[in-house]
Amino acid sequence: MPLPPGLAERLQDPRLHAKVMGADEAAALIAVGANVGMSGFTGAAYLKAVPQALAARLAALHAAGQTQARIGLWTGGSTGPELDGALARAQGIEMRLPYQSDPTCRQQINAGHMLYNDMHLSHVAQAVWSGLLGHLDIAVVEVAGILPGGG
């Protein structure tokens, strides 16, 4: 599959070219029940396409009777409607951390349908490294580019 225009200049490690995929394919790599780290904080660099594809998949599973089809969602802080909102509307979040400000998340947390850890942002990294929060299964990050050595 040829890379979209301009992507080869940003994705400079040719070993990664074969891994380029659409949002639905990427979302399919996220297992139900996984603890998922997603990049972003407020409006900066939070994901939009993959969370919406994941939300659609989880909503379809819920409609088919698999009501436990949810993930743990770890971010750098509050994101936006395409991430927090989409996954919350799909009832796809089992546990959310740290800070969030999405109204649908807040409603589900207050109703006891979503677990929530309002840990201060400065404590999240140490809690993850120490295993206090369980295992981070997969991370999905938005980046501007990748250099030939992977940086």
Predicted regions, residues:
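Conserved alpha/beta enzyme-core scaffold
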Residues: 1-151
